[in-house]
């Protein structure tokens, strides 16, 4: 029996919802709308040395996590748009570990990514609020996945994803006494 590493997965692993539930979608949209503020609070007051500290041994730095959340949110927003405007679009994954090595993720201050998240999440939440149940049932086809994914599952996944990485930062702060 394997155990989940609580430092890597402080809120547990993603559990896909089995079915569409409007009340879940409302909660996910609220969480997506609130993520930029939650993330900004999680990094508030951290200095450059702290921002350049890995959240775990072998993990990304806090700054890389912030930049990754901007990258992932852009991808999620575009995947949602493709799912709404195309018939079962093929979704190319992005190489997260490689993106985290790029110059912007390694050396840029976090403020541009925080600002990007603020604007993007307003647009994304507004788009999600406009969607019907039929829209949320539309499918995307992630490359390499065993089956197509409905947009409601994509929304749940990225809700978890934002909370997951914010919790990693908060866990590091607690462990370090920051």
From Swiss-Prot:
Cellular location(s): Cytoplasm
Broad class of the protein's primary localization: cytoplasm
GO terms of molecular function: hydrolase activity; zinc ion binding
Record keyword Manganese present: no
SUPFAM superfamilies, sorted: DinB/YfiT-like putative metalloenzymes
UniProt EC number: 3.-.-.-
A family per Pfam: DinB_2
Taxonomy, superkingdom: Bacteria
GO annotation, cellular component aspect: cytoplasm
Entry keywords, A to Z: Cytoplasm, Hydrolase, Metal-binding, Zinc
Family per record: Belongs to the metal hydrolase YfiT family.
Protein purpose: Possible metal-dependent hydrolase.
Subunit structure: Homodimer.
Protein name listed in UniProt: Putative metal-dependent hydrolase GTNG_0529
